[in-house]
Amino acid sequence: MSREREGFGEYYETVKKIKKDPAFETTTDHAVMGIRRHVAVPPGTTLNTVTPCAACKLLRRRCAEECPFSPYFSPHEPHKFAAVHKVFGASNVSKMLLEVGESQRGDAANSLVYEANLRLRDPIYGCMGAISALQHHIQSLQSELTTVRTEILRHKYQEATTITSLQNNFNSTTTTSSVSCDQHALASAILLPPPPPPPPTPRPPRLLSSQPAPPPTPPVSLPSPSMVVSSSSSSNSSATNSMYNPPPSSTAGYSNSLSSDNNVHYFD
């Protein structure tokens, strides 16, 4: 601790000598700004010129405008610089801040504060303990994610298997029902009696008794020549007989009429 204070005291004395140098007083404003550029603050931050910074307050010295700790260690949070000073030392912190760019000094100061707090909390591992814990947490989350993905795939596979089994059951049920319908139709066809014969065709209406039905016309057959000759001869003979031999009925009637006329008185 005493060595660090001595080193910081030497640095402070060097700054005082530079400020007391006459050449420093005769420089232009641009040169002064060039010297102060080493302690420039990020945009939106002003130098602490009212109260001493946490570093100067802890080291019990006057805080100059060019103090490298003033923009990054507020006097309202002295515990931050106390942790950094206890772990790294004031001179080492000032060197670290001056080695980085002006736009990154704020992040460097916050990183030093974080590392110092973790080192004080865990002297063995420090930041490595937090990094290992975060790595284990990431691994556990990855394993949980893998488990969830496996469950999702398993549920999807079960759903696909269920849909396939339902389709197979539906197809088998349809096939069984069609086969049973065919068997039932075959059994009913075997057990049922044969169908009745078709009804007979309707007969023509029967004629009255006074009008006997004409006999069916026999098929017309041509007579043979001998029959034609005999029939013609018989017809000729019958005609001859009728010419020379009048029928007896007519002659009898004629004789009766003559006998009855014998009684008629002529010329009365």
From Swiss-Prot:
It holds the Pfam family LOB. Residues 51-152 form the LOB domain. Residues 192-205, 212-222 have a biased composition (Pro residues). Residues 223-243 have a biased composition (Low complexity). Expressed in shoots and roots and at low levels in flowers, but not in leaves or inflorescence stems. InterPro entries: LOB (IPR004883). Residues 250-268 have a biased composition (Polar residues). It comes from the Eukaryota. Residues 191-268 are annotated as: Disordered. GO terms for cellular component: nucleus. One of its GO terms (biological process) is positive regulation of DNA-templated transcription. Belongs to the LOB domain-containing protein family. This is LOB domain-containing protein 13. It comes from Arabidopsis thaliana (Mouse-ear cress).
